A protein has these predicted regions:
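Active-site metal-binding loops of divalent metal-dependent hydrolases
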Residues: 20-21, 79-82, 122, 152-153, ...
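Short beta-strand scaffold segments in enzyme catalytic cores
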Residues: 64-68, 213-218
Length: 297
């Protein structure tokens, strides 16, 4: 079930979650392949936040977009999976028919009103609504927006280098969801060092999950937030930073980036906006002994 989204305030910026999908019944043994330790759940079940697992102890995750409204601009951070996508090696996300644009409108945004689309990386569940299928052609969903993403991601996913076993879930994604906005002249890329954008944002390299992934920080009115991308897919990884998901392409670097992000935001008033956490998908990281813990807001 998709819940009514909260509206968050960071300085003079409002942030709203538009959820494309809420997914349950996900096996932790598979999702955290090679990392999952069932003893963690049994030992911590009574002190973990609610909403992380279903009644069968299977994971709950989400896919969606963060709508960011500043006094000057309407911005989307990541664009979920999209409808009608031809994903021959990822049938679970292929040919969807979901009311994402209707939910976006409920959040107060029409496609033509979007000024910028900021993409943390170019995986299937982050770029899908960049485009939609109109009369058999993929066209930009947000025709007046500039689509901004890491250059390293474009270079990799537009090349044969990405045609490998680890990247099967993303086959055909660049062609349907990224190339059309490139060809429309609507894109801007961020170099591998990251950098500031629109004065209030900063692209921060957090590679590992993908080759050029970047998290995006937001600072407004003396308050801070971090859009973490896929540094973590589920709150269990806050408690267990060494756990990778099955979708992390460069595993050791993914662990390094995850630990670095957790260290940077723990015990500071930085709200963390996740890409795939359940519930509100937002919260705070604090230290707990030698590790970390998570609380939703």
């Amino acid at each position: 079930m998709i819940k009514t989204p909260k509206i968050f305030q960071v300085g003079d910026v409002t942030i709203t979650r538009v959820t494309e999908m809420a997914l349950g019944g996900i096996s932790p043994e598979i999702y955290f392949s090679g990392s999952w330790n069932p003893a963690f759940l049994e030992e911590n079940r009574n002190c973990l936040p609610a909403g992380l697992i279903d009644g069968d102890s299977q994971l709950i995750v989400s896919i969606g977009t963060w709508v960011v409204k500043t006094p000057k601009h309407t911005i989307l951070i990541d664009t979920a999976t999209g409808n009608d996508k031809n994903l021959p090696l990822n049938p679970a996300l292929a040919n969807l028919q979901l009311p994402y644009l209707e939910r976006l409108q409920e959040a107060g945004v029409l496609p033509e009103e979007v000024d910028y689309v900021l993409l943390t990386h170019l995986h299937v569940d982050h770029v899908g609504w960049n485009t939609r299928l109109i009369d058999g052609k993929w066209v930009p969903t947000f025709p007046n927006a500039t689509y901004v993403f890491p250059l390293a991601e474009q270079q990799y996913y537009s090349s044969e280098a990405s045609h490998n076993k680890e990247n099967e879930a993303n086959f055909n994604v660049y062609e349907e969801s990224v190339l059309p906005v490139v060809e429309a002249g609507l894109t801007q890329t961020i170099g591998p060092e990251g950098g500031e954008f629109l004065d209030i944002f900063k692209f921060i390299p957090t590679t590992g999950h993908s080759i050029g992934q970047m998290s995006i920080s937001l600072t407004s009115g003396g308050e801070e937030a971090l859009f973490g991308a896929d540094v973590m897919h589920h709150p269990f990884q806050v408690f267990n930073p060494e756990w990778n998901s099955m979708y992390c392409e460069f595993t050791e670097q993914a662990r390094i980036s995850r630990r670095r992000v957790l260290e940077s935001i723990a015990d500071r008033p930085v709200i963390y906006f996740s890409s795939h956490f359940p519930e509100s998908a937002a919260g705070y990281v604090t230290r707990s002994g030698d590790g970390f813990k998570w609380d939703f807001v």
